[in-house]
């Protein structure tokens, strides 16, 4: 049994602060697989399809033909979707890429009329700061 604790957040239209500094787009497995493989070598076509079946869709901020940061929307219920699987390349952390992908996913969730949720490990202060800056 894990002793890990999590901090849970919710963002609303009133609290949301979009951060349009970097362009972010949805990833398509068929065309973006080479980029995904460089960023996330463990991901397989089967794993990607399984994630899609479980309600995940991934987006990325790309620069210089590389994914700099990635996040997903997890459509876990009819009423609420979660910002999930946020990761930034270690060598480019602190540049706002995580905020860009989190804001992109959050805007998608709120635009669909769903509750936007987010959770992270209680000791992950960097991710908590990102969430708070976006309006969670």
Give short role names for the model-derived ranges.
Residues 83, 101, 105-109, 127:
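Short hydrophobic clusters on alpha-helical segments that form packing/core surfaces
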Residues 1, 99, 122-136:
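Conserved active-site alpha-helix within GNAT-family acetyltransferase domains
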Residues 1, 109-121:
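Conserved GNAT acetyl-CoA-binding A-motif
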Residues 46-89:
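A conserved beta-strand-loop-helix scaffold within acyl/acetyltransferase catalytic domains
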Residues 86-93, 121:
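A short, internal acetyl-CoA/4′-phosphopantetheine-binding micro-motif in the GNAT/acyltransferase core
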Residues 23-35:
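A short beta-loop-alpha structural element at the N-terminal edge
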Residues 1-22:
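Acyl-donor-binding surface of acyltransferase catalytic domains
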Residues 91-92, 96-101:
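Conserved acetyl-CoA pyrophosphate-binding loop and the N-cap/start of the following alpha-helix
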């Amino acid at each position: 049994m894990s002793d890990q604790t999590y901090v849970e957040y919710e963002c609303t239209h009133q609290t949301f602060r979009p951060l349009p500094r970097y362009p972010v787009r949805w990833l398509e497995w068929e065309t973006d697989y080479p980029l995904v493989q460089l960023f996330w070598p463990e991901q397989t076509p089967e794993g990607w399809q399984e994630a899609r079946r479980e309600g995940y869709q991934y987006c990325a901020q790309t620069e210089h033909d590389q994914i700099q940061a990635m996040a997903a929307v997890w459509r876990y219920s009819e009423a609420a979707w979660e910002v999930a699987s946020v990761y930034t390349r270690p060598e480019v952390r602190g540049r706002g890429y995580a905020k860009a992908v989190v804001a992109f996913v959050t805007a998608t969730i709120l635009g669909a009329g769903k509750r936007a949720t987010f959770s992270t490990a209680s000791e992950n202060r960097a991710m908590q700061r990102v969430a708070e800056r976006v309006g969670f």
